[in-house]
């Protein structure tokens, strides 16, 4: 693919970012799965948070071996507690199998932390090359999965340092009349909040946000949260 949404590697495994919209993620039977959070999205389809959580439970039950879950997200853990499945957790604030401790903002908007694993007293320093506190959770999830499949903590640290971000995820387009132009695919209030907080953490003096509604139904249902 040229500027597409996939990248072909040389291994036997495939990594997919699955979406819960219209239960599309229920078409998958993953060997391992990661649940970062469960937010009030796609409720025009599901009708309630209860039905949305039930869909995530079905997805988790389709996971063949291990589920990795964010222990700081209540909705996620509400689902995990109902499962008869192997679950490993990651977190910043709560007790978990993989934790980020000694978090430091080494330059405005960019973070580093010590990776603390459940089965050792050793820690590994992880430095992120992408901005935003929310990316600590993304990196924790990566570390948890990679450690589980046999990569070293040092390899995880190297991967985190070398990862420069994905398209339309706080992507810098350039400058216009001295203003830095950044594009982000955030289309849910939680995502918008993370994007705006990242920009604020980076110390920009003036912030102008231009929001393009992604769907009419989401905008109507979550209008107050968007505001």
Task: Report residues per predicted region.
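Short, glycine/acidic-enriched loop or turn micro-motifs at the edges of active sites
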Residues: 20, 40, 73, 186-188, ...
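Short beta-strand-centered segment that lines the nucleotide-binding/catalytic pocket of NTP-utilizing
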Residues: 1
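Conserved motor-coupling elements within RecA-like helicase/translocase cores
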Residues: 7-11
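Acidic/glycine-enriched edge-of-secondary-structure segments
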Residues: 177-187, 213-217
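Active-site beta-alpha connecting loops in nucleotide-dependent enzymes
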Residues: 166-168, 190-227
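Switch II (G3) loop of P-loop NTPases
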Residues: 12-21, 181-187
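Short, flexible loop motifs at catalytic/binding sites
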Residues: 23-32
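Acidic, Mg2+-coordinating active-site environments of NTP-dependent enzymes
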Residues: 32-181, 204-206
């Amino acid at each position: 693919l040229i500027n597409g949404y996939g990248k072909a590697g040389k291994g036997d495994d495939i990594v997919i970012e699955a979406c819960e919209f219209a239960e599309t993620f229920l078409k998958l039977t993953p060997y391992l799965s990661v649940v970062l959070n469960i937010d009030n999205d796609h409720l025009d389809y599901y009708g309630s948070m209860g039905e949305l959580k039930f869909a995530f439970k079905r997805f988790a039950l389709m996971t063949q071996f291990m589920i990795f879950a964010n222990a700081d997200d209540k909705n996620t853990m509400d689902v995990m507690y109902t499962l008869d499945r192997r679950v490993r957790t990651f977190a910043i604030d709560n007790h978990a199998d993989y934790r980020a401790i000694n978090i430091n903002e080494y330059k405005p908007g960019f973070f580093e932390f010590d990776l603390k694993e459940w089965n050792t007293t050793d820690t590994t320093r992880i430095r992120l090359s992408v901005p935003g506190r929310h990316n600590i959770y993304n990196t924790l999830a990566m570390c948890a999965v990679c450690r589980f499949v046999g990569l070293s903590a040092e390899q995880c640290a190297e991967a985190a340092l070398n990862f420069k971000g994905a398209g339309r995820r706080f992507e810098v387009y350039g400058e216009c009349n001295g203003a830095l132009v950044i594009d982000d695919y955030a289309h849910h209030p939680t995502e918008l909040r993370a994007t705006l907080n990242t920009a604020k953490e980076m110390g920009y003096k003036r912030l102008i946000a231009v929001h393009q509604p992604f769907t009419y139904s989401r905008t109507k249902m979550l209008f107050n949260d968007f505001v």
